[in-house]
Amino acid sequence: MGFPYNNGFTGTYKRKFNPASYKYAYVEDMNLSKDVWERVPNFFNLYKIHGSISWYKDEGDIFEKDYVDIDSDDTVMIYPTPLKDRTTLMVPYSDLFRNFESSLLKQNSVLVTLGYSFADDHINRLILNALAIPTFKLIVL
C-alpha cells in the first residue's frame, strides 16, 4: 500500500528496537524556520504485540532482520503457552504494551486489527478501555 509507518525499530544497517520511537513525530519538511511542521500524511504506528519472526535477540537487545529465516531459533515471539502472560511483562513486550495503550487512549485514535482473534484478555482490556472514548475507532479486518 505504500503507507509510511513506524514499527519501533530505529537505525539503517542494524535496526534496533527502540520503544521511544513510538513517541517521535514524523514530519514532511525539516525546515527549522517553520513555526508549525506538517505531519507525514497516512503515517501510522505498527505494534507487533506478540513479537515477530523477523525479530531476533543479540546480547540482550532486540533487532529486526532484513530477511526472515523461519528455521531460526533466535526469533523473539510470544507463543501460545501457559507462560504467555508472564512473557508479556518482559522486554520488549512491556514497552510495546505501554506504547500501544498510550496510542489507543489518545483522542481520535484508530485501531486496525488484522488476523486478531480477540482471544487475549490482556489485549482485549486495552481495547475495551479505548472503546469508552467517543472518538476512538476500531476496524476489524
Predicted regions and their residues:
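SIR2/sirtuin-family catalytic core signature
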Residues: 86-88, 94-141
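Extended, H/D-rich, highly charged conserved domains that either
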Residues: 1-77
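N-terminal start-of-chain detector that recognizes signal peptides
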Residues: 16-22, 82-85, 110-113
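Residue-identity detector for threonine
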Residues: 10-12, 75, 81, 87-88, ...
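Flexible internal linker/loop segments at domain or repeat junctions
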Residues: 60-98, 103
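Generic structural signal for short, flexible, solvent-exposed coil/loop and linker residues
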Residues: 35-38, 42, 67-68, 82, ...
